[in-house]
């Protein structure tokens, strides 16, 4: 999975978010909190998902900006995994009265999305699908399996779209082969 490491990715994200948040905080003269979805499942592979990095990044932000203390950092999943994020999302959807499947079918975890062109289109039209074989997709599907819900995202492989049960079976085989 180290092939998916983008050097300094979360620092880049946090720099952009911090600058916007600080601008809003200064304009409104209020405290602004930013949230990041970094989680424990990524600690081993992505150094910028660790608490030590977050602390150092926030300290640098505060040292380098006037009134930076007006921006707070919220990382609720730092000690959790994709399943914890999914459980929280399910709970939030219930509280807000919104359709979980409608929300989550519009999300993407895949590092290898697959574009399938419409056969009738000569203008490049088509649909994007998530792969189900990359590590991030396997972790996502595993979280849905643990939650006991089908993942509403549409999956595909090199042959075309596949039903969720195919993606689920693939992940279950991987988990079984690793004794999980």
What are these regions (language model features)?
Residues 1-180:
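Nucleotide-activated chemistry modules centered on ATP-dependent adenylation/adenylyltransferase
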